């Protein structure tokens, strides 16, 4: 079982609740509202200010950190498919934010804090609790409407190419 609080990631025994191992995150996660995501022997956590950090699931050693160009709160669950993770950020009801695709590959195993570059990003009105569905043909994700309050009711449902981020429909 993996969890996190403040700037600490923890591996916890699911039977006893004992903390088996801890690691240090590059920052905190705004409100810690999403669970960590596991894939390919790694743990991925969305951090405040538009960051995602990858950890070795056994050692909890940092592998890389992604810093999104537009920043934002990490309010979206991280989805995994075919060697990539997908997540979105939120800046406010009236500011744009990115939905990002990141390769899970650790390009430089000698560094624990290497700066991860995105495979692609898609900019829209923000992604607030917008968990994505991903398969080999498309990424399906919802967005904010870009207006203050609940006045328009016109958020979007986007279908994106999972390899390029180009809008399909």
Regions found by a protein language model. Name each.
Residues 1-169:
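Extracytoplasmic/lumenal domain signature
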């Amino acid at each position: 079982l993996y969890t996190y609080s403040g700037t600490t990631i923890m591996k916890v025994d699911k039977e006893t609740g004992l903390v088996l191992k801890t690691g240090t995150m590059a920052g905190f996660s705004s409100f810690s509202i999403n669970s960590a995501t596991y894939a390919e022997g790694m743990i991925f956590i969305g951090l405040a200010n538009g960051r995602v950090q990858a950890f070795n699931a056994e050692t909890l050693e940092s592998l890389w950190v992604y810093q999104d160009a537009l920043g934002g709160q990490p309010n979206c669950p991280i989805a995994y498919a075919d060697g990539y993770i997908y997540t979105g950020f939120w800046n406010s009801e009236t500011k744009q934010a990115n939905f990002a695709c990141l390769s899970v590959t650790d390009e430089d195993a000698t560094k624990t804090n290497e700066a991860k570059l995105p495979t692609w990003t898609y900019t829209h009105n923000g992604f607030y609790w917008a968990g994505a569905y991903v398969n080999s043909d498309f990424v399906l994700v919802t967005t904010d409407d870009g207006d203050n309050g609940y006045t328009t009711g016109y958020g979007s449902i986007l279908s994106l190419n999972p390899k390029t981020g180009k809008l399909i429909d």
